[in-house]
Design a protein with these regions (language model features):
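RNA pseudouridine synthases
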Residues: 1-179, 183-188, 214
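Pseudouridine synthase
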Residues: 32, 105-113, 186, 215-256
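Short coil-to-beta-strand transition motifs
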Residues: 72-76, 196-205
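Conserved hydrophobic positions within beta-strands
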Residues: 80, 169, 206-209, 244
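Well-ordered beta-strand positions
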Residues: 81-82, 208-213, 224
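Structural detector for hydrophobic anchor residues on beta-strands
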Residues: 165, 180, 203-205, 219
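C-terminal amphipathic alpha-helical segment
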Residues: 191-199, 210-212
């Protein structure tokens, strides 16, 4: 069984293991029960039986790492931007899906990440924390196990991780900075599309012109209020926002 070893941090001082797993890693009840039943939690290399014991700075906590079923590998060498024991950040190329939606889809970014993990001898999962459109290139966060995906998903949901698009557009964009605050709802003519609608959900996009020349405009678009994919924002504003522009390149990167 694979373990991950963590030092007790200052803001964990005096907290129990139950509290750390629930409030710091945001593990659900089922995942916490799975760890408890394994009887493989170590504190300073000794079994920790009482999960209500206060933990203190300087101690070393070792937790068993549980994995989901692994997906098929796709022999594609992605650009790895960052990696540690819990996560990795990859540069997803254009025209590649983030993750498979059906069992027959095995050529996605997640499958390529699984290939990298197995090629490098890591007993880990390729768990996408978020997704990008197939036609959008940029950085994608992947968690390596259940412990990591729980914490990163919570951060994404609670906006501790932000998304920013860089877009190259053609046409006129007047203001250097502006905020588009238009609700987005379903397009009743196309089930998979979204459009600006008075009955839609709130959607905010902060736009800043980075470069402005005669041929094209480079924009920074930050969308702070969505927790899985910002693609509906960008597509809806492209179709509905009253400005004569056309997006021909898009790059995404996260910031904390």
């Amino acid at each position: 069984m694979t373990h991950v070893t963590l030092p007790i941090l200052e803001d964990w001082e005096g907290l129990s293991l139950t509290t750390i797993l629930q409030e710091k890693f945001h593990l659900g009840k089922k995942a916490r029960h799975e760890i408890r039943m394994s009887q493989n939690v170590l504190l300073n290399n000794k079994p920790l039986d009482d999960w209500n014991t206060p933990l203190f700075v300087g101690a070393s906590l070792s937790l068993p790492v549980f994995l989901h079923d692994k997906i098929p590998v796709y022999e594609y060498d992605l650009e790895i931007i960052y990696e540690d024991d819990f996560l990795l950040v990859v540069n997803k190329p254009v025209d590649m899906k983030t993750h498979p939606n059906d069992s027959y889809e095995t050529d996605t970014c997640a499958n390529a990440v699984q290939y990298y993990l197995e090629k490098t001898g890591q007993d880990a999962n390729a768990l996408a924390v978020h997704r990008l459109d197939q036609t959008t290139s940029g950085l994608v966060l992947f968690a390596k196990n259940k412990l990591a995906i729980a914490g990163l998903s919570w951060q994404m949901e609670n906006r501790a991780i932000h998304r920013t698009y860089l877009a190259a557009v053609d046409g006129t964009w007047g203001l250097v900075m502006q905020t588009i605050n238009k609700p987005i709802g379903e397009d009743r003519h196309h089930g998979s599309r979204r459009q600006i609608s008075p009955y839609g959900q709130p959607a905010v996009t902060h736009v800043k012109v980075l470069e402005n020349d005669k041929r094209k405009k480079h924009l920074s678009c930050r969308m702070p209020n969505r927790n899985w994919s910002d693609a509906p924002n960008s597509r809806s504003f492209k179709r509905n926002w009253p400005s004569n522009y056309w997006r021909y390149a898009l790059w995404w990167f996260p910031s904390c």
